[in-house]
């Protein structure tokens, strides 16, 4: 088992990661009757995509002996209606260091192969942009 999730009232859930006992709290978003005091469930999907991209980048960087510490992603989730769903996830990945063209390509292709990116429904536009310093 990966986790347990409990509805605690007031449009909030608390998830417990079984192996670490870490908690993940979600609230309904402000635009859907919520307080917006925590990630919404759909925020966790968008954030999960960015986390997966960065994790896969970290694995590849470690394998090839380069450091990408301080690489970060900015995430924007776009919702649609009828039915209410995620229609686009925009992820801007910012690298603090530049590498040669070959290493950049290796890193970018590795990131795009992350399991979350490959698991999301094809109707969700994944707009992923990589930013390298000059």
Annotate each PLM feature.
Residues 1-47, 55-134:
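Extended beta-strand/beta-hairpin segments
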